Amino acid sequence: MTEQYDILIVGGGNAGVSLAAALRRKRQGRVAIADGHQLHRYRPMLNYAAGGQADMARFERPMRAVIPDGVEWIPDHVVAVDAEERTAVTSTGLTVGFRHLVLCPGLTPWWGAIDGLREAYAAGWAASAHVPEHVDAARALLSRVAAGDRVVANVPAEPSSCGGTVLKALFLACAAWERTGILP
């Protein structure tokens, strides 16, 4: 084992970074965030970027820049946890010890869960405001909608991660279509 932490946070998204900052302010010991992404995106803005209300690049920072002072960054993904031994193993084989573990790794799209989903995205007639890599495609798709076109918004069943945010993207798109005369 190379490192030992009082608190290991798996995930460097908004939740992980915010928690790490709060723990450091409260002087809760040695804190680390394990996240292999090199880029941090402020995800609440994804809907606005997809809806043409914001430029996503304004809400992206190098991961190192958002790690709070005094918090260590392990630039790797955790792939296994041994609760009894209080250790985590990263994708490169690094073993990290911890007293307390916080899991907030975020979500990873499961493209194979729906037959044809990958093909729909590749063809350009499906999009998501919740997958950062597809925000620009979502914006382009929504901008091509013309009067009389049909738009289908999929709202996930609860419990889901921020299920209502799908409606926010839809309302932003409707507002844009209303401004341009596509919607009466």
Where are these regions (language model features)?
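FAD-binding core/adjacent interface of flavoenzyme oxidoreductases
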Residues: 1-5, 72-168, 172-181
